């Protein structure tokens, strides 16, 4: 509260005179002017200033000189300090008035009533801006052509919507509030300074102009380097997304080390680029803080010069301008760090707007009734190459007509262009509109060019089932209901939708396994449907495509992962829904397309044969006939005699290979996580990086030195006030000396802050690098059940990897250095205050300190809670966005863009509501913490006045203490402004530390394991299952019990059975993804749990049902997980020849060096990817080869060649093969075939038959019924 100015009465003057035991001159026309003067210890009275002399500052100066010449030492004016008179002419009195005025200016800007809504508004604004810009980014991404989306990795998207959006949010919520508040104070200080002396203000501002020029030079460099750092962060986030999105492949290949090196390379690159900021920060802070403190020296020196020359009439003008400059310096010092954060936010915003402002796909056009889907689809001379491989033509003048209401099948070798036709029909790619482009030709839908149709309307007419179906991490009900988007049923109530969904699931043969799930249609399927088997996922995808009764149905290997009985039923359902609608089928299993109205045989990007099944079979030497012959079994069951009675008793197991995996692990994991306090957490991180102690020492010394600048400034200011005791040359000499001292302080501060900027950033990027490497390694070392938990989905992990080390870096860097400076400043201010006057310091410090610490505790505690809430919500929204981008083709084909954006908006809105409620109460805490310093100032000023009035304190002591309290209060305020950074860094550091192996994991790892040593001769492995039982945590019934299997060295063993019966689980147990609940599995006579993991997995090779490739060249993908010394070039080429992929690779312009790009999964066809994975598996020269539907995506010719190569290796006894297959033609030469089944619902799965292909056919049991299915007949 501002002090009121009260003109003293003569009665008050007489009272004061009596107290001083002195005489005072009285006159009706004169005001009371008096001071207690100290001279050689004796109090004296001095009185000066008449109405006449008050008119002239020069007379006052002369009269002042005469007083001093008479022996009076004018030190201070008690009365004017607290009952000020605007006409007072005594310089010390004026100095105290100036102090009071400037305190009023500062305090008026930061009252609780103003600060509370200010902080609240900025926090809410930051949350909303962050949410809106993320939503705009995702929306813009969905509006891009798929050719551009293929160039954006999931890791880049995750990094952008987490790390970069958090930077923007923090900048607005915390730093921008400080910036605007400081700018307002800056403007007020300049207005006051200009009001008192424009000349002095302008000259002083020249030093500040130096700050502006310096910032204009350094900030562009900061932004440029920050953008390079962001690019490096995107790269390592992209690698992390690939790794954790394909974690089973990575672990099975033993590729953790090689992929970690890739990740580490870009982490180190980010550190190197971050080091480039160290020098820029050093220069930036040197220029800024030197100029700021030099402005003190300039203001005082030039002000005294103007005063002596008579251009300034009163010394309080100099003091007022000086204080204004001090406020400006304090403000600019406080915004130095926020300014850097704002520049980072500007760089982050650039990454957002680069995509947001890019050109969008024009989705408008014709729709019903102007256009219709009940027409022919015609390809005319279509030529097409993918943007990622412009030198490799895919379609070469293709002409095809898909007749309305008819079923057209596309068959042919992998890579012949079948899926490309689907992509063009879905308008994921567009043919050229100009003759210069090599993508030429036309696609017509009836009379209309396909590009003239409304994009969303056209896609809503199509039901698509892809070869690798994608399910969202949602319920089964919602996953199927997504197929209703864009139809007349989209807005119907759930009761209506339920009927449609249940009908579609029945037709897709999915209802049977859904009903056996504990939660039925409400079951969460996990990331990409990980909690369901491949066949179950495919059936749900079929249900999703047929639920809307589309006019056009496209089936791209729609039944490849479904078991024999399931495929038969589903195929019959597809045949029914295909009637009277345009259907396009792509298949390698020719039995599924034999009833097609028209079959087109593709080869080399053109159609080489067309006709019906019967017509094509009659062509001697025809391509189609050769494909059919390649799929015949050696011994066929009677074709139709038992078909009608082939009702199997097999039933799908209710639980899938990864159904709600290890839910108890989640509870255990949560109990093991430790929520350490802030000091302990950061202290532990710093302690573990103690090898960097030289940087620690440099940061500590430089921040301590910078922190002493404020206390020294307080002392220097008091000395400057004492200068006014002198006159003449002595005044000039003293003024020049102390101005020089301020200049030397400016030099020292410039050097110290430069050191702070350089060393703090250098330290932070190194510790961040170490934390990020360790974090990645720790999560990569987690077992598969950890990754199966929903909160540990790949998107969430990538989000944490991108954000957590960054938060630690922010705190240990400049955001940690400035609080350190504030801490040392507070300590220094308290120390210097006590040294000049213990009584005033004691009262002020111990009255304010408890409130200060209470406010700090409350604020940091709130920020920790707020950060924990934010982290949980952002992880969910980021995972959702990453999942949607990863499934871009599925989202676009279902026209789910608006639904995805609505759901994403809902997630963000929920987060905003929670944050809004938190912020509403938190701003009161913020206001309280920032008001404590103001209360300390007021208390100091009041109690100091009492001490001055009682003549216990000299003015110098009062000024030093008061200035120290002001500076200490400002330091406390700056310290509190970093509370959010403390909370975020503590939460992030806790997650990093909690990712480390727990005590039980370390105990298990410390047990000595047997190391497997590879011999020179390649021999197969002997594997045995002894009474093995296995149950997932969520299952009441084991998946299987008492499993006994014996696989001899060099044998080819196959497992068949319905989807979900446990076939893939056998593979997972052999790979040690999971451990058996009971029983043992031996490898060459040794329990696999006693074998060292890495050497054991080196003996295995796995080819999964869904092949996974990584960014890099073809060579790098094939040799992934292998050291260069483990294979020769000849062995590499032979493995590719055995996998029937060598010819394709050599046909590419760059051969084995061909880069697969960011989206490696979409750069090749399914069959090409699968053959590369087979080549990768063969190159490892395993003793045990695991095949999980390994040839499901291959055409018949390729499959026959690949199968023959593996059979030859098995015959040589050089490896043992364990295969899981639905396509029985691939396992007819197996030494032993194990047939899984379930006796009754609710019981564990079991092996119902075993034997060779011929033995099982003669037994005419379950296997014979499978073979009797028409899918194996030509």
Curated annotation (Swiss-Prot):
Compartments, as annotated in UniProt: Cell membrane
Record flagged with keyword Transmembrane: yes
Keywords annotated in UniProt: ATP-binding, Cell membrane, Glycoprotein, Membrane, Nucleotide-binding, Repeat, Transmembrane, Transmembrane helix, Transport
Residue ranges of domain ABC transporter in the record: 377-629, 1023-1269
Matches recorded under InterPro entries: AAA+_ATPase, ABC1_TM_dom, ABC1_TM_sf, ABC_transporter-like_ATP-bd, ABC_transporter-like_CS, P-loop_NTPase, Type_1_exporter
Residues of the ABC transmembrane type-1 domain: 120-344, 697-984
Membrane topology annotation: Multi-pass membrane protein
Induction: Expression is induced upon voriconazole treatment.
One annotated GO molecular function: ABC-type transporter activity
Residues with glycosylation annotation: 48, 473, 580, 792, 1044, 1117
Residues reported in the UniProt entry to bind ATP: 412-419, 1057-1064
GO cellular component, one term: membrane
Gene Ontology annotations of biological process type: transmembrane transport
TM spans (from-to): 183-203, 205-225, 280-300, 321-341, 697-717, 737-757, 818-838, 840-860, 924-944
The protein's role, per its UniProt record: Pleiotropic ABC efflux transporter that may be involved in A.fumigatus adaptation to azoles such as vorizonazole.
Similarity field: Belongs to the ABC transporter superfamily. ABCB family. Multidrug resistance exporter (TC 3.A.1.201) subfamily.
Name of this chain's protein: ABC multidrug transporter E
